[in-house]
A protein has these predicted regions:
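Core dinuclear metal-dependent hydrolase active-site scaffold
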Residues: 20-23, 101-129
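Conserved beta-strand hairpin/beta-sheet module of binuclear metal-dependent hydrolase folds
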Residues: 2-47, 123-137
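Active-site metal-binding loops of divalent metal-dependent hydrolases
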Residues: 33-35, 59, 84, 107, ...
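Metallo-beta-lactamase
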Residues: 118-187
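Active-site HxH/HxHxD metal-binding segment of metal-dependent hydrolases
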Residues: 16, 28, 35-110, 132
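Divalent metal-coordination and catalytic microenvironments
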Residues: 22, 32, 58, 70, ...
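Short Gly/Pro-enriched turn/cap motifs at secondary-structure boundaries
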Residues: 10-11, 93, 113-115
């Protein structure tokens, strides 16, 4: 990967959802069309990009409320984990598995599947200004893991985050969660 990506971010809804727009030239990849489609489309317009891809990190209601409208307005390709896609209220064009990549603006952006918060959330790996950025949905936050509903789910999420994130990436890797502030793996 190169450092061709620029990052734009907006927080929407009463749930304080982070929506991220990755810009490569005139193309945009939106991470989570959580809510307030007009604000998301305005963010893209102000950045001078057309949203050509949308990644839904996981199936929870607060991450998909603007999804149908954004997809309808943009014609973007919709990506989501194959484990969560059956419960996402919009057609998923590409179902992602562990080790897959999203091909966006000539870049291959790796995907990590994180099980536990939902059956299988999709995290996106990028390089922005020479620093690895992980867009993790609600699987990892500053200070700990995302919410789980059973001991088995907690263990799955802990193992996935440990093996697929902490064991693989340096401490200066930026974690960009679905809500709240970003952090680094070393913090």
């Amino acid at each position: 990967m190169t450092n061709e990506l620029q990052l734009h971010q907006i927080s929407v809804s009463e749930m304080d959802n982070n929506c991220y727009l990755l810009q490569a030239g005139e193309e945009g990849l939106l991470v989570d069309a959580a809510d307030d489609a007009p604000a998301l489309l305005d963010m893209a317009q102000k950045a001078g990009v057309k949203i050509t891809a949308v990644l839904t990190t996981h199936r929870h209601w607060d991450h998909v409320r603007a999804l149908k409208e954004v997809l309808s307005e943009t014609g973007a390709t919709h990506y989501a984990s194959f484990l969560d896609s059956p419960a996402i209220p919009a057609e998923v064009d590409v179902e992602l598995r562990e080790g897959d990549s999203i091909k966006f603006a000539g870049l291959d952006l790796p995907i990590i599947i994180l099980r536990g918060h939902t059956p299988g959330g999709a995290a996106l790996v990028t390089n922005i200004d020479g620093v690895i950025n992980l867009f993790v949905g609600d699987s990892l936050f500053p200070g700990g893991l995302g919410k789980t509903t059973s001991e088995g789910d907690f263990v799955r999420l802990y193992k996935d985050v440990t093996a697929r994130i902490f064991d693989e990436f340096p401490d200066n890797t930026i974690v960009r969660p679905g809500h709240g502030k970003s952090t680094t793996l070393g913090e």
